[in-house]
Amino acid sequence: MTSAAPPPLSAIALICTLKGRDAPSSSDLIADQLLGQLRSGGVECEKVRCVDLSLLPGVEADMGEGDDWPALLAKIKSANILVMSTPTWVGHMSSVAQRVLERLDAELSDQDHAGRPRMVGKVALAAVVGNEDGAHKIVADLFQALNDIGFSIPAQGCTYWNGEAMQGVDYLELDQTPEAVATTTAAAARNAAHLAEVLRQSPYPPYAGPD
């Protein structure tokens, strides 16, 4: 008897642009490209533009009436891979991305049956765009926070584009995607899917023994 094939891996991309759903967004575009690479590897993908939700300030899993975070958190918990896509503003990630990290911080105290924080075993990717410097710092900040919360970071798990200094061309205005960006995006997606499958088949050991 052959065992049933495991379900496909899944990914959710949180688009942390400051622009609403109807506005073109470079953060949305680079996330789409990353999700496209994940889909080509058999990963089921979804994306959410966070600015269209009411993500209330705070560090609790549910901040009460009017908070859309619990529904979004449920999607993050059900996915194997989290993609954080953010623009660069004044050299930093967007305020929306920072809000997401603050809300995820509550998950440190939510443990599974083996005493592991709920996000342990999930994989995180970062995508950053901007026409100013800052991508490396933003990726470092994102990965420090996400790893602290419990996410695993794959090898070369980020993709980014920064335009020339003192000019106003956005990523979505380019005639074509630079080869270096496309190659980096493909590698990040490939490595994330690989790591997610490894962690699904061989989870991290328990943090605490049975009572």
Q: PLM features: what roles do these ranges have?
A:
Residues 113-164, 180-183:
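Short, glycine-/small-residue-rich phosphate/pyrophosphate-handling segment
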Residues 3, 7, 11-18, 126-128, ...:
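Ligand-binding pocket scaffold of soluble enzyme catalytic domains
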Residues 165-169, 173:
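Short amphipathic alpha-helical oligomerization segments
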Residues 1-114, 172-211:
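N-terminal beta1-alpha1-beta2 submodule of the flavodoxin-like/Rossmannoid cofactor-binding fold
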